[in-house]
């Protein structure tokens, strides 16, 4: 589909942007014959990014670490889930009226539901962690939180560990011996992205 004056723009803001969102959403727009494009942007100031959204009439955007909590200061309305979680990752712009949603919890909920577990340990207590905690509460999964200042406890952990901190590639060794099972989190990312697409397109899946 050719970009024209009527093409809607969606984007994401992150301190460490990647290409996954661009690949996913642009393919979805094309497959559904929707006149829209998606672009990932680097940002170190979410307030300025929000101003750009309003100036350029960007229809919707995602935020990732470290903006999932701070973004709440710059929107006009919070969804019920965002009010409960205290963090957002998806924003809709309707004539410069911004409403915040959270789709992270949907991905976490659907993934955790397949595990059929009663307890887990969550690493980190940022925006994504808050969504995982919300999902755990809905599923009645008991959890404890390990924050960065408690990192010395990590090698002693047993059972299910849900890492909600940024992962950097390290080919030299392992922080934790993850046997017998590890999951990269790609399935959670896909689940939440599909939920974002529904919000961006008013229900199209």
Task: Please state what every model-predicted region is.
Residues 9, 60, 119, 160-162, ...:
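Structural motif
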Residues 63-70, 128, 166-169, 180-181:
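Short glycine-rich anion-binding loops that position phosphate/pyrophosphate groups of nucleotides
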Residues 100-107, 112-137:
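Glycine-rich adenosine-cofactor-binding loop
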Residues 49-54, 151-157:
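Short amphipathic alpha-helix with an adjacent loop that forms part of the alpha/beta core around
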Residues 176-205:
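Adenosine-phosphate binding glycine-rich loop
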Residues 2-113:
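Phosphate/diphosphate ligand-binding glycine-rich loop within oxidoreductases
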Residues 153-172:
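Rossmann-like NAD(P)-binding element
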